[in-house]
Amino acid sequence: LPTGNGKSIDFSLDGSAIAVTHENSPYVTAYPWSGSGFGTKYADPVTLPASIGRATSFSTVGDPQTAYNEYVAVAQDGTPFVQAYPWSASGFGSKFSNPATLPADTCWGISFSSDSSALAVAHGSAPRVSAYPWSGSGFGTKFANPATLPVTTGRGIAFSPDDSAIAVAHTGSPYVSAYPWSGSGFGTKFANPATLPTGPGYGVDFSPDGSVIAVAHDGTPYVTAYPWSGSGFGTKFSNPSTTHTGDSFGVAFSPDGAAIAVAGYNSPFITAYPWSGSGFGTKFANPATLPASDANGVSFSPDGSAIAVAHAVSPWVSAYPWSGSGFGTKFADPSTLPTGTGKGVNFSPDGSAIAVGHFTSPYVTAYPWSGSGFGTKYSNPSPLPNSYVPAVAFGRIAV
């Protein structure tokens, strides 16, 4: 207990701690806080206040967990084709209203812009990509379609880190289309890369510094990467010396840009390489315990300490420690598994949660995430997505 008469009290902005000022040394006492109440008291400050504490307050400055409002959005097979919810340490909030103009049909890919001022989806029918302003109030009025549309089903979508470009992976040649992006929406389509991917594009990602764009696709080499600049695509990087073993559906760069991972068909289902300014390095060793089957999505945690894979057979999602040496020993499966084929996976911006889009209701499943792996499953969102979720994305806006 505090050691004297309590004088003031305050919660941290993310609700994970509570502090009390009081008479008698140490004059301030703090505890973890959760839905179960008080946790074990934190150690006293090394330098104590000099006398009775009269007031206490938590600051947002420099704290990425408390300086943002967070959101989670899902691409889905059935109308309204995209849904979004507030996100917090408690899990899903009440669903935002649907956009006034819905995507045309099944959404396969979804992405917030880096500053979360926009939310974009890739979908099956024209215009094959739809984008909306995003704010704490939810969806804004849909941006005008790009003047030159992707030519067939949009499957993957990504914004460049500086939000100056948006790229769509799609199933018909040229297999990837990219556009300038601004607060006004889509600009004039960039020229196609001189050397195209070799088959239908399913996933796309930019490197963290925005200097590279990579596409996961059908057909060897299954992943194709290009330099990226304000002028668009550069000359294709050489293929990796050891390619993935089948058609690829997801691609992701590590947060430090030092690795690239590809998820797809055929064992080992996940393939990762060092990445540098010269392109692909020598393939990392496969994880000792492979994902159970064909992989559909891949994501690194924001701090780069973990990598997760969504796949087609139980446990539907597999996660591993990640380091400069590659894969670590697989984390234990979550105690409550997703209910069907894992299609997409993503970590929250602060790395405290992980969400999986999948077949079978509830269609999206989320867990706390820590250095120990999966925590106890969050309650399902209400209302649920009304059909399976091929992709999931988190966003956040500074308070």
Regions from the PLM with identified roles:
Residues 23, 77, 124, 171, ...:
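Short loop/turn segments immediately following the C-termini of beta-strands
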Residues 26-31, 80-85, 127-132, 174-179, ...:
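Structural motif
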Residues 365-368, 386-399:
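Blade-level signature of beta-propeller repeat domains, shared across WD40, Kelch, NHL, RCC1
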